[in-house]
C-alpha cells in the first residue's frame, strides 16, 4: 500500500492589509482617468463646461495630434489595466505599469515641450499631471514590493 502525502505548505503568502487600500485606490484613480479620456476624446461640450475649460483649452483637445494621442491612450488604459491586474495579484502588473509609465512620461515630454500644455491648460492641470506621474511611479514600486513578498502570482 502506497501512502501519498500532500505537500506541506511552509510559507503562506498573506496579503498585507494595505493591499486592499492601495489596489482599489488605483482602480478609482485610473478609472477616473479613463472617464476623462472618453469624455475628452468624445468632445463632450457638457464635460468641457463642467471642467471649466475655455475655448483655447477645448481647441487643444479637439485638434490633438496622433503621436500624443497614442501616448495618452496607452498611458490611460495601460494604467487602468495595471490597477486591475494588481487586484487580481497578477505578476503581469509590473510590465504593464512600466509600459503605462513610459508612455505617460513620453506624453508629458511631448505635450509640455512641444504643445504648450502648461500655457494652455494652466498650472492646476500641470501639477495634477505631475501628481499622477508620481503616483504611477509609486504604483510601480508598490508592485515590485508585492512581487518580492510573493504576493503576486
Protein language model features and the residues they cover:
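Topology signature of small-to-medium multi-pass alpha-helical membrane proteins
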Residues: 2-153
Amino acid at each position: 500500500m502506497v501512502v501519498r502525502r500532500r505537500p506541506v505548505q511552509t510559507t503562506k503568502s498573506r496579503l498585507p492589509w494595505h493591499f486592499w487600500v492601495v489596489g482599489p485606490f488605483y482602480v478609482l484613480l485610473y478609472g477616473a482617468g479613463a472617464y476623462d479620456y472618453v469624455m475628452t476624446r468624445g468632445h463632450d461640450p457638457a464635460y468641457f463646461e463642467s471642467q471649466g475649460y475655455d475655448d483655447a483649452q477645448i481647441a487643444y483637445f479637439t485638434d490633438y495630434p496622433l503621436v500624443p494621442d497614442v501616448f495618452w491612450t496607452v498611458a490611460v488604459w495601460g494604467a487602468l489595466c495595471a490597477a486591475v491586474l494588481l487586484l487580481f495579484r497578477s505578476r503581469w502588473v509590473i510590465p504593464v505599469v512600466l509600459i503605462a509609465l513610459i508612455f505617460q512620461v513620453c506624453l508629458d515630454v511631448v505635450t509640455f515641450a512641444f504643445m504648450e500644455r502648461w500655457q494652455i491648460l494652466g498650472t492646476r492641470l500641470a501639477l495634477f499631471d505631475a501628481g499622477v506621474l508620481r503616483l504611477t511611479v509609486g504604483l510601480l514600486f508598490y508592485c515590485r514590493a508585492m512581487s518580492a513578498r510573493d504576493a503576486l502570482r
